[in-house]
Amino acid sequence: MNARTFPHPPQPLTDGTAPILAGFECGRLHWNGHDLLHSTAHLPHAAMPHHYAVAREQGVAGARDGLSWRHDIGARVNAVPQGFPVIWDLVHFDAPPRPVQHAVACCQALGPDAWAIAVNEPSVGRRVSGMTPGRATDMALRMMATAACLPVRPRFATCDPFHHLHPSVFKATDRLVASGHVDMVGVNYYPHHAAEPLHRILRAVADRYRLPVMIAETGWHDGLRAAHRRFPHVRDRWDWLAHVQAEIALSGVPVAGLCWYPWLDMPAWDDPAHGRWPCGWPGRQA
């Protein structure tokens, strides 16, 4: 099984920046049934092996991916190159009808020393995920508690948006960390939503939780006016990557990884048949 992922504790780079991870979109949108694994062909029998081969060629340190209850869990795990580090989302905008059973199935497929995220972005709410923040957080807690009872369980990270420092932004992560099942805190930070500099976000998160920190999602959408308005010095995706790495170094926080999300230019959520959003990795994708 290709279960081995990041060392514990995760290791940042010695120059104050973070190693790059490839983030593969793996959700299913509740309002229109758009399965992003299908629309990007990120499937074991399709382009998934090629996607990983190209990501490795680009020098990434690992990836984020997903184990949807609608897909063959074992086939997805085994499609990853042997020994390549992956953090697996167990739920990504598509709640399984039986979350506990899904958690057990994922843990059995992953084996020892794996990393997982129980529920992606529990704070985003019903409009995006189909779940209220409370329900999504409760689901994550049940899944992690179930995993803790198994003889073999993954280490868990969190993954939630942190674009400002209002107390409300910490609510879901506070509950998850308080459970005692979390080994790393993930910060999602996008330029079109950012209201606080990233270095302040990272320092606040590191000081609050005293756990390893990673940037679980960040990226740049070419031509998105809100992003250009907030960061007029950023011209393109390479500039955004440099900006994020500079903010990591400025924070002084040893960030375990920087996940570029999504790695592939993304089919439009509401109209996947017509073009792709220019937001994937600025180097060769796949």
Language-model regions, residue ranges each:
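Short polar catalytic/cofactor-binding loops
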Residues: 24-30
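Catalytic domains of carbohydrate-active enzymes, especially glycoside hydrolases
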Residues: 42-68, 85, 180, 184-185
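Acidic/histidine-rich helix-loop elements
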Residues: 30-42
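Catalytic-core regions built around general acid/base machinery
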Residues: 75-83
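Active-site region of glycoside hydrolase catalytic domains
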Residues: 2-16, 21, 83-229, 243-286
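Short beta-strand segments enriched in hydrophobic/aromatic residues
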Residues: 26, 67-69, 189, 220
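Short secondary-structure subsegments characteristic of cysteine-rich extracellular domains
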Residues: 233-240
